[in-house]
A protein has these predicted regions:
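Active-site "substrate specificity/gating" loop of NAD(P)-dependent dehydrogenases
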Residues: 1-9, 31
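Active-site segment of SDR-like NAD(P)-dependent oxidoreductases
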Residues: 1-4, 26, 102
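Short, flexible catalytic-loop segment of classical short-chain dehydrogenase/reductase
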Residues: 3, 20, 41-52
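A short hydrophobic alpha-helix cap/turn motif
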Residues: 30-32, 45, 71, 84
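Short, small/polar-rich loop/turn modules that mediate ligand/substrate recognition or access, typified
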Residues: 31, 36, 91-93
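A short C-terminal helix-loop "cap" of Rossmann-like NAD(P)-dependent dehydrogenase/epimerase domains
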Residues: 51-65
């Protein structure tokens, strides 16, 4: 939500935006030591907590996502695994949105 905001969630969105700022600052500070710092920004993910929501709420969430479904925890894990791999060695200070296109 740090990338697009949401009504009634000022505190939550502000903390997420703070994490993005921290990520970018740490990337600059630690990059010279060979340390990369990145963030993953998940969209609506089908977690145990989300599964307990009423069906109409889940449908509303799906309707907001361009790919018309909620993400899976494994898809978030895959982004983290990529960032931890050698394939991402030159990626630094980046936020990867794993959100089905919500931030497009």
């Amino acid at each position: 939500m740090a990338l697009y905001g949401n009504f009634g969630q000022t505190n939550y969105v502000a903390t997420k935006a703070g994490l993005i700022g921290m990520t970018k600052t740490m990337a600059r500070e630690l990059g010279k030591k060979g340390v990369t710092v990145n963030a993953v920004a998940p969209g609506f993910i089908l977690t145990d907590m989300v599964r307990k929501m009423p069906e109409e709420v889940l449908k509303s969430m799906e309707d907001k996502v361009p790919v018309k479904r909620l993400g899976k925890p494994e898809e978030i894990a895959a982004a983290y695994a990529f960032l931890a791999s050698d394939d991402a060695a030159y990626i630094n200070g980046t936020v990867i949105s794993v959100d089905g296109g919500m931030t497009v």
